[in-house]
Amino acid sequence: MGLVSSKKPDKEKPIKEKDKGQWSPLKVSAQDKDAPPLPPLVVFNHLTPPPPDEHLDEDKHFVVALYDYTAMNDRDLQMLKGEKLQVLKGTGDWWLARSLVTGREGYVPSNFVARVESLEMERWFFRSQGRKEAERQLLAPINKAGSFLIRESETNKGAFSLSVKDVTTQGELIKHYKIRCLDEGGYYISPRITFPSLQALVQHYSKKGDGLCQRLTLPCVRPAPQNPWAQDEWEIPRQSLRLVRKLGSGQFGEVWMGYYKNNMKVAIKTLKEGTMSPEAFLGEANVMKALQHERLVRLYAVVTKEPIYIVTEYMARGCLLDFLKTDEGSRLSLPRLIDMSAQIAEGMAYIERMNSIHRDLRAANILVSEALCCKIADFGLARIIDSEYTAQEGAKFPIKWTAPEAIHFGVFTIKADVWSFGVLLMEVVTYGRVPYPGMSNPEVIRNLERGYRMPRPDTCPPELYRGVIAECWRSRPEERPTFEFLQSVLEDFYTATERQYELQP
């Protein structure tokens, strides 16, 4: 397409041999067979099939498969990426559909398909993605310079934003550009050149940067769709699980990487016999089941016969403490570390709203995904509470992360978690250094009684130490900030010095 031409490409023109394997902004993602596929998502919520709805507007209910899907039972409809289907019943996580290729009917996960001719078919379109989450996804190591996405504007309804990954001598940055709409239809970033569609805009800036920070290269790698695992799969047979690799062990048992039905990779936590009763273990599982948030490690299912298993989502990079000590983790920039801390605060703010506590918040209990997103794990001693949770006598808890009132009186509230979060922040900014270096647990207790606090390390900005960490360590629990406040401060830590949008090229 030329600079101002609006001629549409010939859809019937075959792809030349030299083009195979290369991403093109004009290739619809669902038809792009040579693009690296996302990991398949296995889904399990098989409910009683509802009858087809005979009153659907068929013109609006044709979809294309965005991913391959392998049927899990005879009620599912197996489909291949790019396959066209007619939706017969389109509500909830599962849609009843008929393949226009095979003529077969069955259920498909709704997040595996997109309407024909919709923007959702484009690999670069992230409709409801917010600015902060767009930055997090583009900063994932798999995305290189020029990776991009287009999303709906958060502030200007009907408009869009282009987010692009830039790599400079100062490091990796995400630049945002406003995509403005013309009254008569069409779009532009710079008023000197307009485009009839977002696809045409992407095509132009994929050929040359033309004033952008980078030429657009590849769409941001999209995380696999969320798994709609439902209530009826809560208790599963042990035979459906296969333990593959031991990841670690803790107070209550071991953690393994394994597979559910030889298909979906999961983490499997086993109960160490004699550590706690099966009833207490199931209590832990029920608490985790009630707490559902994108910043919390998701609970899938349990095996209720001994040895008891609890099945959760698998986080590829393991715990944050170990990751910070790796070559990749030790090279993370301070803004990236603060953003990861903001993600943890977001998860804890949800726990706070749910009137719950964690009670063992530390870097070892934060897990990291392949895209370097953080999720809170190990709710082994968390409890739904009215106002406070009193630990049982003899319960083990990590002194260096525990608030003074919890050490001395065994009383845990969300404010004790706030204290622990301050210690966790010190772990993060020191890339996994042990808190209170050189001190034994009794020395830590005595020093805290005298008002001692860990000093600011050289790697910690004074504003972060004074405005966040020190506030978490106030002696009076009620004077400590809320996690909601901590989340907002950490998310906006660099906003005051950032330009919200790049200037028009």
Curated annotation (Swiss-Prot):
Gene3D superfamilies: Phosphorylase Kinase, domain 1, SH2 domain, SH3 Domains, Transferase(Phosphotransferase) domain 1. The lineage of its organism: Eukaryota, Metazoa, Chordata, Craniata, Vertebrata. A lipid is attached at residue 2 (N-myristoyl glycine). Its EC number is 2.7.10.2. The gene is BLK. This is Tyrosine-protein kinase Blk. It comes from Homo sapiens (Human). Residues 241-494 form the Protein kinase domain. One of its GO terms (molecular function) is ATP binding. One of its GO terms (cellular component) is cytosol. Non-receptor tyrosine kinase involved in B-lymphocyte development, differentiation and signaling. B-cell receptor (BCR) signaling requires a tight regulation of several protein tyrosine kinases and phosphatases, and associated coreceptors. Binding of antigen to the B-cell antigen receptor (BCR) triggers signaling that ultimately leads to B-cell activation. Signaling through BLK plays an important role in transmitting signals through surface immunoglobulins and supports the pro-B to pre-B transition, as well as the signaling for growth arrest and apoptosis downstream of B-cell receptor.
